[in-house]
Amino acid sequence: MPPRALDQLMSHFGITASALPLTDIQLDSRRVGPGSLFVAIRGHQMDGRRFIEQAVAQGATAVLFEEDGEFVAPVTSIPCFGLKDLPARLSELAGHFYDHPAQKLQLVGITGTNGKSTTALLVANWRTLLGGKAGVMGTIGNGLFGNLIEAENTTGSAVQVQANLAALQQQGADLVAMEVSSHGLVQHRVAALPFSAAVFTNLSRDHLDYHGTMEAYGAAKEELLKLVDEPCAVINADDRLGRQWLAAYPGAVAFGVHGPIENHAGRQLTAQDPHFHQQGFDTRINSSWGNGVLSAPLLGRFNVSNVLAAMGAMLVLGYDFDALLASAPKLQPVTGRMECFGGGKAPLAVVDYAHTPDALEKALQALRVHCEGRLWCLVGCGGDRDRGKRPMMAAMAEQHADCVILTDDNPRTEAPEQIMADMVAGLRDPGSVQIEHDRVKAIQLALSQASKQDIILVAGKGHEDYQIIGTDKRHYSDRETVAAALHTLMESFT
């Protein structure tokens, strides 16, 4: 990308500046160099304005800081400007810098506690099957569909979001499906993006360490719907909050797995009597765009909902209903989302990202209809995060699985024994579960004890390829561990 002129960039905010060339925008002073515009704002944990002098010392071309009437900027040898409400305007600033890439794309925003990654990948997969070139941004990675690069956060900074969109547009993407987290919405990271469609999947307990209450968490999610015209909103009518929002947004598209949606005059998309089998599901689709049978190679009732969410977004964007039905059997299962390993002579192990009580319950319920033997659940909880959901996670495992193994997830700086104690507190019969802190050994234990008719849900990490113990982020993958343990098990049969 050619350099941008400082004066042109600042003119959008009524600031007069000289025509210095800018090559990048940085929020982290450690990444600043010649050509950088250092943007100094108050973060959730740290005030970036404390590092203005460090950025200047590292060669920054200019500084733009958050003006609040109290902060006094240091005297610098480079241009240094203050701007009120800078965090809320950062998406706009980055949009101007990167020449508004989202205006040249179909941009689908997806929010909700569960299902964001799967829905985003299904949208991108569908666009690819129909002959386009689609990008993905979210927890599972950023990049063109089929070539994702690991992402640090579900929704990056406002600057990262615009930079990623620009990169995808330059690579030829004509559609981008983007997970939008509640954090990202509250922190205005997508405030200036012209979304073509917005999807709400569901709301259940998560991130209360940040939002405080479920009401605040739900209000954060609703911000995405406010960024699109009402007919471009796609809302889950099976979700309690979704039903409330459909009353407030009567022109939105409603989708659901439980048949016709009552008291909604807008467009609808529903599944009727889905049939589940080992290869996926088949279901009758009734919609405002037409009716037909949809088959997809995905496990579980909640994936019927995810497919409907993705299909709703595609229909809002103008894609053909019959073409979507015809291509649905070619949709690809998502890495680390109800991903199957083994089977046959060995137990079937299913790796899934379920890390909330609601997601864990849905995953276990989904697998129960496929299970001829015992249903196992291996699960842990992260450290330095919402303690309130730990007993709920254990309770869900105990309620819906026949055999439970509790193990470590990402303990971070918290004592694994304390995390485990919080989980055990949610059990009715603590003596009925097994505890193995070492996640590798826990997976090996489950596979060694299960029969070939059994299904083992390995929950919590999904696609992740790391484990955080203390402050050490080390390589670890449930998918790799399960595959290796199954290989060893199969060798023992020969």
Outline where the language-model segments fall.
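N-terminal leader/targeting and accessory segments in enzymes
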Residues: 1-92, 96, 240, 293, ...
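Phosphate-binding loop of NTP-binding sites
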Residues: 10, 89-237, 241-251, 308, ...
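Short glycine-rich anion-binding loops that position phosphate/pyrophosphate groups of nucleotides
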Residues: 43-44, 182-183, 205-206, 239-240, ...
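Active-site beta-alpha connecting loops in nucleotide-dependent enzymes
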Residues: 43-46, 334, 358-361, 365-428, ...
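Receiver (REC) domain switch/active-site residues of two-component response regulators
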Residues: 61, 196, 402
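Acidic, Mg2+-coordinating active-site environments of NTP-dependent enzymes
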Residues: 69-76, 177, 195-349, 372, ...
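Short acidic-hydrophobic, aromatic-tinged amphipathic segments that line or gate anion-handling sites
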Residues: 80-85, 434-438, 442
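Glycine/aspartate-rich loop-and-adjacent alpha/beta segment that forms the canonical ThDP
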Residues: 455-488
